[in-house]
Amino acid sequence: MNKEMNRLKVVLAETKRTNRWLAEQLGKDQATVSKWCTNTSQPSLETLFQIAECLGVTVQELISKNSTKDHE
């Protein structure tokens, strides 16, 4: 069963950012960010807030299939 816990890969594409850029912003290894993007592992709640801030989105947009933009 493929459970997507986050939409990080989609949000990175929407914001025209790369795994490498995000890894640099967070001081994390690029392989770690790649695992988050493929839902192989998940970032901590604290890190989710940091990711949201870096990308200019809400945490909800990172984890919900129905982002707030879909409702506008």
State each model region's role:
Residues 2, 10-11, 15-16, 35, ...:
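Short, charged recognition helix plus adjacent turn
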Residues 21, 32, 61:
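Residues in the helix-turn-helix
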Residues 22-23, 51:
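Short alpha-helical "recognition helix" segments of helix-turn-helix
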Residues 28-43:
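Recognition helix of helix-turn-helix/homeodomain-like DNA-binding domains
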Residues 46-61:
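DNA major-groove recognition helix of helix-turn-helix/homeodomain DNA-binding modules
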